C-alpha cells in the first residue's frame, strides 16, 4: 500500500524494488532482458489487493512481488495459487500468507517472532513475570502473541496479564495498563 494505515511499508517496498530494478536494468538487465515494473496500491485491503492482482495479471505480469501486509496477502495467495503465479512477499508475516508452494516470504513469520521474543527474554534473564498488551483485531499482533504465550509457558515465564485492545480503541491503554500492574 502507498496510501492508508500501512503506507509506510508499501512505499518502502516500492522504492526498494524500483532501486533494484534500475540497477539491474542499467547493468544490462537479466540475460539482456530489461525488467518492467508496475505497481498497484491495495491500501492494505484484501478486496482491493485481489483487484490489484487481477489488474497486474491482465497487464501481463509474470511474477508478483507482494503483497506487503498479511491479510491482503492471504487473500491474494488464493488467486496466485489458482493461477500458478510465483509470489514473493517482502513482509507478510502471517503463516497463511505463504500456504502454497508458489508463495514465498523474505522475512520471519508471526510465530517466529513470538517464539524469538520469549526466547530472548528467557535467555537474557530479563523477566520472569510478563504483562502483554496486544491488538486482538490485528492478524500480526495476535499471531505474534499466540506463539509468544506458548513459548513463554514452555520456558517457565509467567504471563501475569494478557490484555487485548482493538483497532478502534488504540489510543487509550489505561485500562490494560491498570490490569498489568
In which residue ranges do the predicted regions lie?
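Alpha-helical elements of the RecA-like P-loop NTPase motor core of helicases
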Residues: 7, 47, 74, 115, ...
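Active-site segment of extracytoplasmic enzymes that catalyze sulfate/phosphate-ester chemistry
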Residues: 100
